Structures are given as structure tokens and as C-alpha cells.
């Protein structure tokens, strides 16, 4: 028999011996347990329970994408490594450019917070704005100088003010009263329901 045949036989025997070792030794040295817990399905460190159709965190896909990117990088660099002498400086420059592009992409992903999963990372995010900033006035934003600023649609009706809470009619005088009410919008974005023009006339009559 040739040396090639002997090496093939040795490889097959070593593979069989390894399988037998992994099956027999744990059975002889390992402990045994009995009961319902032995029959439970245990996979990836988690006891299976509940519905299998659950939401999977999208961060898992980020890890998978990173793995694919750098796995392919290692494959290409292996091809360069085995032919580094033949490739010369030109091959070195090409490999350096390739690695630089991947590093730039990795830094960009890290700057976007793609790998920030810890609770402490969430606390460092920008706090949500719950109050109006200084100098903010919704009344100034929605203020009209006159009824002529409102556009008339093809049906001849004047559209409502942008907040959708001011009733605008075809009566010009009614619209003027509504425009005075618009000037009293508070900073919370809620439109006041008081007719200030009517209230002012009532106050003048009482006086």
C-alpha cells in the first residue's frame, strides 16, 4: 500500500475514534438526572416556552451584517497573504485601500450608535423635549395680519386656520373675530375657545 492509502486509513480511524470518545467518555464520567426537567427542550441557553413566533431584535441583523462584512474581508486578505511575494507593492497598496474602506465604514456605523445596546447607552441619548423652548410663541407662528391672507378655494370657502380648531365661515366679520382669537393661542398649542372680540364688547358695555 502506498503512503497516500495509509494516510487515508489513519484519518478515517482517527475520526471514528474521536466520535467514540465524545460519546462514551461523557456517559461514563458525567452525572445522570431523572425527572421532567431532563425532558425539557433547552437550546442556546434558553428554555423554550411560549409562542415561537416572537419579535426578534433587529440588532441581531446588525451583528450578522458585521460578521459577513469582516468574514469576506478575511477571505480576500487570505488570498493576498498566500501571494504576498508575487503581488509586491502594488498588491500591498490594493490591500491597504481595501482595509481602509472597511475601517471607514466601521467607524461610521459606530458613530451612528449601531453597537450601542446597553441601558447606559440609552440614558446618554438626547432627552426628549417636553416644554417649549425659550422664546417660542405659537401665536406668532399662526398669526394673520388680515383676512385677505387666507386663500380662497375653488368652492368659494375660506379654509380653516392651520390648527384646524378655528371655525372660518364666508362671513367676513365673523372671520375677523376668529382672527383676533388666533392671536390668543397659548404656547401649548391649544386654541382658546373664548371669543375675545365679543368679550371686549361686553366689557365696554358694562363699563
From Swiss-Prot:
It catalyses: a quinone + NADH + 5 H(+)(in) = a quinol + NAD(+) + 4 H(+)(out). NDH-1 shuttles electrons from NADH, via FMN and iron-sulfur (Fe-S) centers, to quinones in the respiratory chain. The immediate electron acceptor for the enzyme in this species is believed to be ubiquinone. Couples the redox reaction to proton translocation (for every two electrons transferred, four hydrogen ions are translocated across the cytoplasmic membrane), and thus conserves the redox energy in a proton gradient. The lineage of its organism: Bacteria, Pseudomonadati, Pseudomonadota, Gammaproteobacteria, Moraxellales. Gene3D superfamilies: NADH:ubiquinone/plastoquinone oxidoreductase, chain 3. This is NADH-quinone oxidoreductase subunit A. NDH-1 is composed of 14 different subunits. Subunits NuoA, H, J, K, L, M, N constitute the membrane sector of the complex. Its EC number is 7.1.1.-. Disulfide bonds: none annotated. The chain crosses the membrane at residues 6-26, 62-82, 87-107. GO terms for molecular function: NADH dehydrogenase (ubiquinone) activity; NADH:ubiquinone reductase (non-electrogenic) activity; quinone binding. It is a multi-pass membrane protein. Keywords: Cell inner membrane, Cell membrane, Membrane, NAD, Quinone, Translocase, Transmembrane, Transmembrane helix, Transport, Ubiquinone. One of its GO terms (cellular component) is plasma membrane. It is found in: Cell inner membrane. Belongs to the complex I subunit 3 family.
Amino acid at each position: 500500500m502506498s503512503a497516500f492509502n495509509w494516510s487515508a486509513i489513519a484519518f478515517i480511524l482517527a475520526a471514528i475514534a474521536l466520535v467514540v470518545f465524545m460519546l462514551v467518555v461523557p456517559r461514563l464520567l458525567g452525572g445522570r438526572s431523572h425527572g421532567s426537567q431532563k425532558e425539557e427542550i433547552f437550546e442556546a441557553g434558553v428554555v423554550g416556552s411560549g409562542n415561537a413566533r416572537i419579535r426578534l431584535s433587529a440588532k441581531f441583523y446588525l451583528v450578522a451584517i458585521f460578521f459577513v462584512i469582516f468574514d469576506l474581508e478575511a477571505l480576500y486578505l487570505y488570498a493576498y497573504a498566500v501571494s504576498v511575494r508575487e503581488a509586491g507593492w502594488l498588491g500591498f497598496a490594493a490591500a491597504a485601500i481595501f482595509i481602509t474602506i472597511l475601517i471607514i465604514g466601521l467607524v461610521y456605523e459606530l458613530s451612528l450608535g449601531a453597537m450601542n445596546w446597553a441601558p447606559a447607552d440609552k440614558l446618554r441619548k438626547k432627552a426628549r423635549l417636553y416644554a417649549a423652548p425659550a422664546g417660542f410663541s405659537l401665536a406668532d407662528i399662526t398669526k394673520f395680519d388680515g383676512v385677505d391672507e387666507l386663500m380662497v378655494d375653488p368652492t368659494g370657502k375660506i379654509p380653516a386656520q392651520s390648527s384646524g380648531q378655528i371655525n372660518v365661515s364666508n362671513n367676513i366679520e365673523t372671520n375677523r373675530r376668529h382672527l383676533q382669537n388666533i392671536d390668543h393661542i397659548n404656547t401649548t398649542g391649544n386654541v382658546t375657545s373664548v371669543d375675545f372680540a365679543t368679550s371686549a364688547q361686553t366689557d365696554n358695555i358694562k363699563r
